[in-house]
Amino acid sequence: MFRTMLNSKIHRATVTQADLHYVGSVTIDADLMAAADLLPGEQVTIVDINNGARLETYAISGPAGSGIIGINGAAARLVHPGDLVIIISYGIMDDAEARRHVPKVLFVDAENRIVGQGGDPAAALPGDPSSLRGDVLDPAGARGLGGGA
């Protein structure tokens, strides 16, 4: 059996530009692509934290060190400059490899510079009081997102 597993994610990247009339894709700073183990043309999922939009496209490399996260083509109707996004890649692997696999998890600042990295897909950025681990419940609804009983 093969499993589709998280290969990498760039967490809370800031969209720097959007171009509706570009042919398509997402332009990602080459340094971020390398750190996230992304290849040009690789399929990625983009999740917009601001509005909940979720879409699939492919990655293209932008200038290294530029911090660019550019939404191209029709996706520019869903994701806008200034939006926070999670860029996710998946890998297909056999069961044994999936059980050993450690994803690359990147945390970036407002300029899309790497400020933390690891291999725990549920991890929150250390020292960031505005985020919770993905495997922690918020039963009191303290985040204001409708949590609680």
Curated annotation (Swiss-Prot):
Q: Does the keyword Lyase apply?
A: yes
The primary location reported for this protein is cytoplasm
- Keyword Lyase on entry: yes
Q: What EC number(s) does this enzyme carry?
A: 4.1.1.11
Q: Which SUPFAM superfamilies match?
A: ADC-like
> One GO MF term, please?
aspartate 1-decarboxylase activity
Subunit structure of this entry? Heterooctamer of four alpha and four beta subunits.
This chain's function reads: Catalyzes the pyruvoyl-dependent decarboxylation of aspartate to produce beta-alanine.
The identity of this protein, by name, is Aspartate 1-decarboxylase
Gene encoding this polypeptide?
panD
